[in-house]
């Protein structure tokens, strides 16, 4: 297909289109086991934003490395891990110590509806946050 990753073979002038490394416009899939994608969202104060919506039939877990900064400079970096199926989801979060102010009122949550898991972030920090995340989705076998 036209969406394969091209790699050098070590032979001059020869390249190989890898069938187990697939790029789409938004994601990179490795060996049919892991999909990696990026997301960038702005969440105004007093609102929530969705970071990820994924099928519990297709995927069983997500690892989300994130960073965010508020418009007043408070920032945090961390990882959210989500274990889910088409009916239930649980999550945990680890993060750095805050910089330039408290970020305790920026809270991640997970829910399942219609077989899909949604990871969202609620912002009550007092200003808009800009969140950037790298999402690794693990396929269900």
Positions of PLM-derived features:
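Surface-exposed ligand/attachment interfaces on beta-rich extracellular proteins
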Residues: 13-15, 35-61, 69-75, 88, ...
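Small-residue hinge/turn detector
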Residues: 5-8
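Broad, structure-driven detector of short, well-ordered beta-strand segments within folded domains
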Residues: 21, 76-84, 106-110
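Beta-strand elements of well-folded, non-transmembrane domains
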Residues: 68-70, 84-86, 137-139
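Terminal beta-strand-rich extracellular "head" domains
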Residues: 81-103
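C-terminal interaction-tip segments
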Residues: 124-141
């Amino acid at each position: 297909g036209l969406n394969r990753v091209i790699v050098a073979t070590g032979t001059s002038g020869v390249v190989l289109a890898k069938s187990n490394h697939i790029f789409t416009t938004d994601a990179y899939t490795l060996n049919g086991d892991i999909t990696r994608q990026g997301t960038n969202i702005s969440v105004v104060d007093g609102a929530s934003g969705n970071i990820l919506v994924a099928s519990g039939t297709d995927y069983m877990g997500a690892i989300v490395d994130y960073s965010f900064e508020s418009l007043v400079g408070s920032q945090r970096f961390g990882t959210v891990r989500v274990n889910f199926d088409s009916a239930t989801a649980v999550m945990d979060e680890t993060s750095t110590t805050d910089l330039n102010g408290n970020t305790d009122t920026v809270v991640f949550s997970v829910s399942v509806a219609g077989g899909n898991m949604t990871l969202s972030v609620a912002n009550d920090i007092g200003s808009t946050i800009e969140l950037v995340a790298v999402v690794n989705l693990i396929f269900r076998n």
